[in-house]
Swiss-Prot record:
This is LPS-assembly protein LptD. Residues 1-25 form the signal peptide. HAMAP family: LPS_assembly_LptD. InterPro entries: LipoPS_assembly_LptD, LptD, LptD_C, OstA-like_N. Keywords: Cell outer membrane, Membrane, Signal. Disulfide bonds: none annotated. Component of the lipopolysaccharide transport and assembly complex. Interacts with LptE and LptA. It comes from Nitrosomonas eutropha (strain DSM 101675 / C91 / Nm57). It is found in: Cell outer membrane.
Length: 725
């Protein structure tokens, strides 16, 4: 070996043995297959593949982790790191601070003293006395504090002896936890877990507390069971001071082409009534393949007072007939421009009775088969067939079988500015009854054939106009609709499902005046109507619509249900207005005027002012001569700072009675909300129920109390949660 080569070798060995000093950056590799470590600092000392000591503005990167501190000691052979002074560990799922850190970079095991932490992907943060790193995405905090409030805000927090954070499952688990609001303990839980993401997880949900006039103080503790990605269950023990312990159970499922929900609430022994009480709701729908679809909707309660005593949902408590129904349907194309549908239906109702005013329950349908076919543009004609076969059953009224068929053909003549559509059909009905429908007749097999003719026509005229600085299209749409149906005697036919339809602008253009199939009205009448729409030229949105119309009769009406014979030459006068009267102001109004005496028969008015989310005022008035007169008022409106007020009233002027009322307040802080709502409503059995909702919502953690959101949504059209904005 030459002298020069020997000198090079000696110099290389000396460089390896010399400590590293005054180096700004160094890339190092630990043992095995570990990721490279990059260190930046004011000063770095150490030996290659042994111990590295960095001081001053230290920044150490390994993979997706970054460690910052005043002083770092790194052992390359074991990948242990020791950090002193202002330790900051940044990772994809969280950021950790502390005064002293010991950890292994490969196993993520170690400890952090005097820790503070912030969870990414959410607002969770906190502190503790000691943080134990227990592997990738896992750590445990001793004497922990947790909150979702921002820095320097301690309105609410959890104090726990032990808090586990699982960043992989996005779940926190606290032991011996005290929830504090404004530094006051409000709830102690020996064990609790919570999610700091929107993903579903198994565990106890926040307790629900409230008070009702019928059940007293209520406390519920829901348990959510995430059984599988496509089905879950919520089991809720509900303790009522006056009635005992009720178990509310909800099961939901969804699959390919199917889905459903089962709600079963069970009170084994009501302390007030000394009876077993329950409520059941089951909904299921499913595509069966090859054009078939099935659905089931079953509702039942144990007794007539169930909703009044145990319900807190306005929609349910106002129900009289609880639907119990199963359907199966088939859909298929019928060649080109055609559709064939077949369906079967089983239907009955549980009638919730008011002992002071009992009603007759509806007929059972056991079963009904329907077959409908539509074929369009056959040599310019549209063919239609509607048919049904139904078995009606009732414990006290005459019942039996009914067959109906209504074939029709229409000739649609249309172009860009108007249309003419004549149609002719024959409605046939046949009965097979267990007993004659009325005393004095022996016919148990009556039938009826009624031809029906109609002619619908209309024109659409347009013009451009400028209004309020905007460009609009105004339409003028006159429409004429003529119907001829000869009179057929029907007083001796049963009436299973026919009722007179509400008179409205849309009903002016219908051939039939009755729903169902048992009554076919006679008609020789013409409808004259005019509509005008205001359409925004750029967007195509309809800004305003005004419609007016009247049906003129050329002969007296003879087919009636309960009303006296109508001999007037014309129907009542109908006018409707809907759309935006001004910015943020919407209206929907209608009036029905008696043409003979110019008396108002019906009024429907509604106006809404909604300048921004969380700001809405609604007002409505409804009037039907000799039937009802009601006023509806509701609002959601902010006042002061962070406060909102709620109010709603449905009042009967005819009976001088409050039908439903609501009053509430909400305070929205940056990380919590407090809601107080009182509601009172009349049930289907004409009895009143009063509920008080108090709820404290700790953002991204839990809700304590009874949730009034559903009641607010039902009572105030346009209500939105401003804490989610």
């Amino acid at each position: 070996m030459s002298l020069l080569s020997k000198l090079h070798l000696i110099l290389y060995i000396c460089l390896l043995l010399l400590p590293l000093r005054f180096v700004n950056a160094e890339q190092l590799s630990g043992s095995g297959e570990s990721q490279p470590v990059h260190i930046e600092a004011d000063r770095i000392d150490g030996h290659y593949q042994q111990e590295i000591e960095a001081t001053g503005n230290v920044r150490m990167r390994r993979g997706d982790q970054t460690l910052s501190a005043d002083h770092v000691k790194y052992y390359q052979d074991t990948e242990d790191v020791e950090v002193k002074g202002n330790a900051l560990l940044e990772r994809p799922d969280d950021t950790l601070w502390g005064t002293f850190l010991q950890m292994n970079l490969q196993t993520d095991i170690g400890e952090l003293r005097d820790p503070r932490y912030a969870l990414k992907g959410g607002n969770g943060r906190g502190s503790g006395s000691l943080l134990l790193l227990e592997g990738e995405n896992q750590y445990r905090i001793k004497k922990a504090r947790y909150t979702t409030c921002p820095e320097d805000n301690h309105d609410w927090y959890i104090l726990a002896d032990d808090l586990e954070i699982d960043n992989e499952k996005k779940v926190g688990t606290a032991r011996h936890a005290s929830i504090r609001f404004k530094d006051v303990p409000i709830l102690y839980l020996p064990w609790m877990n919570f999610s700091f993401s929107k993903e579903r997880k198994t565990g106890f949900l926040s307790p629900i507390m409230g008070n009702t006039s019928r059940s007293g103080v209520e406390v519920s503790v829901p348990f959510y069971w995430n059984i599988a990605p496509n089905y879950d269950a919520t089991i809720t023990p509900r303790l009522m001071s006056r009635r005992g312990v009720m178990l509310d159970n909800e099961f939901r499922y969804i699959g390919q082409g199917l889905g459903g929900r089962l709600q079963f609430d069970y009170l084994p022994n009501d302390l007030v009534t000394d009876t077993t009480r329950y409520g059941l709701q089951f909904n299921h729908s499913q595509f069966l393949g090859s054009g078939w679809f099935g659905a089931l909707n079953y509702n039942r309660v144990s007794d007539h007072n169930y909703f009044r005593d145990l319900g807190n949902n306005i929609l349910f408590t106002s129900q009289v007939n609880l639907l119990q129904q199963a359907t199966a349907s088939y859909f298929s194309e019928l060649g080109r421009n055609g559709m064939l549908t077949f369906s079967t239906l089983m239907q009955q109702f549980q009638t919730v009775q008011d002992p002071r005013a009992p009603i007759i329950s509806p007929f059972k349908i056991l079963p009904r088969f329907t077959l409908n076919a539509v074929k369009s543009n056959v040599y310019g004609l549209d063919f239609d067939l509607a048919s049904s076969f139904t078995h009606f059953s009732h414990p006290t009224l005459p019942h039996g079988l009914r067959f109906t068929a209504f074939p029709s053909v229409a000739l649609p003549l249309e172009n860009s500015f108007g249309f003419i559509r004549p149609r002719v059909g024959l409605h046939y009905t046949k009965y097979d009854l267990n007993t004659p429908a009325f005393p004095g007749t022996n016919d148990k097999h009556p039938d009826r054939s009624v031809p029906i003719f109609s002619l619908d026509s209309g024109v659409v005229l347009e013009r451009d106009m400028t209004l309020g600085g905007g460009n609009f299209i105004q339409t003028l749409e006159p429409r004429v609709f003529y119907t001829y149906i000869p009179y057929r005697e029907q007083r001796l036919l049963p009436n299973f499902d026919s009722a007179e339809m509400d008179f409205s602008f849309a009903q002016l253009f219908m051939e039939k005046r009755f729903s169902g199939e048992d009554r076919i009205n006679d008609a020789n009448e013409i409808t004259l109507a005019m509509s005008s729409r205001l359409i925004h030229s750029a967007t195509g949105n309809e800004r305003l619509r005004f419609s007016v119309g009247q049906r003129i009769r050329f002969s007296d009406r003879r087919v009636l249900l309960t009303s006296p014979q109508v001999t007037r030459a014309g129907s009542d006068f109908i006018a409707e207005l809907s759309g935006s009267l001004a910015q943020h102001v919407k209206t929907d109004a209608g009036i029905q005027l008696n043409q003979n005496n110019l008396l108002i028969e019906k009024i429907r008015t509604g106006i809404s002012y909604n300048p921004a989310p969380g700001q809405v005022i609604n007002a409505g008035y409804r009037f039907t001569r000799d039937v009802l007169e009601q006023v509806d008022l509701s609002t959601q409106w902010p006042f002061l700072k962070r406060w909102q007020g709620f109010a709603a009233i449905n009042y009967s002027l005819k009976n001088d009675k409050l039908l439903a009322g609501l009053l509430g307040l909400e305070y929205n802080a940056c990380c919590w909300s407090l809601r107080l709502v009182a509601s009172r409503f009349t049930t289907a059995t004409q009895k009143t129920s009063t509920n008080i909702f108090v709820q404290l919502e700790l953002n991204d953690l839990m809700r304590i109390g009874t949730n009034p959101i559903r009641v607010l949504q039902q009572s105030i059209p346009g209500y939105v949660r401003t804490d989610l904005q």
